Amino acid sequence: MSSKVIDKIMSFLGIEEEEEEIQTPQPVVSYDRRPKVVNIHTNPQIKVLISKPEKFEQVLSICNELKSKKPVIVDLQKMDKSEAQRVVDFLSGAVYALNGEITKISGYIFLVAPENFDVTGDIKEEVNALYNLN
């Protein structure tokens, strides 16, 4: 009983015995400490397709490749002049709509490139130097 009286007096004076808190162990979460390494110098392999359409209807497959962000070299030498002009007109419209670029390499050979493909320099001179086209 005396301990209860002493506890009450100590409580009244603001002096209390601290109760020990029982701490339960928390599970430890482990993280993978290995750094995530990404090679920023990887160059994606760019494939340039070569198309030699013989009919105007084949221009759609060229446009599909262009929509898939693939550059295409179009060789129109096997087509008659009016049909080749229709193909170039159609490709020019597609290139404009897709923010791409069309470049004449030589007579009836064109490079049709999507917007993610940068064409720089005088490509005609470079191709002529490589293949002796005149």
From Swiss-Prot:
Decide whether keyword Cell cycle is in the record: yes
What's in the keyword line of the UniProt record?
A: Cell cycle, Cell division, Cytoplasm, Septation
The role this protein plays is: Cell division protein that is part of the divisome complex and is recruited early to the Z-ring. Probably stimulates Z-ring formation, perhaps through the cross-linking of FtsZ protofilaments. Its function overlaps with FtsA.
Q: How does it assemble?
A: Homodimer. Interacts with FtsZ.
Task: Give the main localization category.
Answer: cytoplasm
- The scientific name of the source species is Caldanaerobacter subterraneus subsp. tengcongensis (strain DSM 15242 / JCM 11007 / NBRC 100824 / MB4) (Thermoanaerobacter tengcongensis)
| Protein's recorded name | Cell division protein SepF
The biological processes this protein is annotated with in GO are: division septum assembly; FtsZ-dependent cytokinesis
Per the record, GO CC terms? Answer: cytoplasm
The cross-references to Gene3D superfamilies, in alphabetical order and at most eight, read: SepF-like protein
Q: Does the keyword Cell division apply?
A: yes
The entry assigns this protein to a family as follows: Belongs to the SepF family.
PANTHER family, alphabetized = CELL DIVISION PROTEIN SEPF
Q: Which InterPro entries does the entry mention? A: Cell_div_SepF, Cell_div_SepF/SepF-rel, SepF-like_sf
Report the locations given in the UniProt record: Cytoplasm
**Residue runs in coiled coils:** none
